[in-house]
């Protein structure tokens, strides 16, 4: 929960050759299932006989789409959708996705989860050649690169294949042309992308398998790192594997926090991975206590695992207000902090007079952890021992999460004892790097643990390029507004 990193975007795409269902409604339900991955904006684009229309706006799925807006989108054989958290670009209608562009060979709609590491160079290169950008997000750069390649190739999939030689970093994409639905996973497989089907011929791509249950399709497989899967207008599926060179290096924090607990990623149930983390944590950092509680939502599974391994009873120490957005997915620190007291309420009968082990999924800035510990103290807890089911964050992420500076990471500013004192805990223990790698032992992939180790599976910029680039763009836009 708390003051944590956000990756966060969710992508969804559906093809229904026989039109046995309503692809717009299916996408709407799919986005509901992926709402936890982004709560700032959302959108849907639908393809009706080669004509793509879209609606998007700032807000939750239920706020952006009522029945009137869904009806306006009409019917079609395929659709894509997106829920967004702004890891790159400001929060406004223009930056919402899917992005819909028109070019000399037709239309293109795209939904993107991830971050490009060479966005600044690519944007400058494109602008020097006359490109005019309407957003401050790197997804528009991907659109431009694909369109450039499309003008030189015979198919959209070949254009995407060529574009992957130019774009670097993390990207899980669903792309829709007038004739095809295409799913793309970057060459390192940083972000998840899964495929599902049903007996009626519907094919679905999504960030997580939890979206499949929402629309009634079965999980088939995860896309491989570097893979392009193409569904043409006849429903024929084929895979392009030119860039499939290695196993995915998926962000391990998908298992710790991002993914919904009922999802399965790389054949590893997320719930079991989190319980495993708790079990390992109990072995690494035991402490005498009366009750183990978890911080909703991601900390609950780890707390269960800790309780199982330690033999200490598990209790429901918090009630969560479901109508408050996730605190780490609030765009400013002030909003994150103000949301905590509204979101969590202590069950005093569980903690009063007891030595409490509080299991949470991470500590980034430390401010939320301090507030939660205080809530437990105010609820009557005699001792509060904090256990974290992830290692300390010591380095920025360049691949789609919102850790952009060591200055914002408490583990870069304080040692363990100082952090413990800062958050008001009686003791503090983090899961080890080895432990976090072992939590998803059934996953058929490697992991990116760069934010914990400063060792990344791909080249990184020399500086926090994302923030520097956004400042540059926003200044240019402000100057333009003044001139107008």
Where do the protein language model's features map onto the residues?
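Conserved short alpha-helical segments that host acidic/polar catalytic motifs at enzyme active sites
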Residues: 1-225, 230-289, 295, 383, ...
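Generic beta-strand/beta-sheet core signal
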Residues: 111, 176, 184-185, 196, ...
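Secondary-structure transition/capping motifs at alpha-helix termini
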Residues: 131, 152-153, 286-290, 308-315, ...
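A conserved beta-strand->alpha-helix junction
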Residues: 135, 140-143, 314-325, 422-440
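PRPP-dependent phosphoribosyltransferase catalytic core
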Residues: 164, 179-180, 216-222, 374-484
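Short, glycine/charge-rich flexible loops or terminal/linker lids adjacent to PRPP-binding catalytic cores
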Residues: 311-356, 367, 394-404
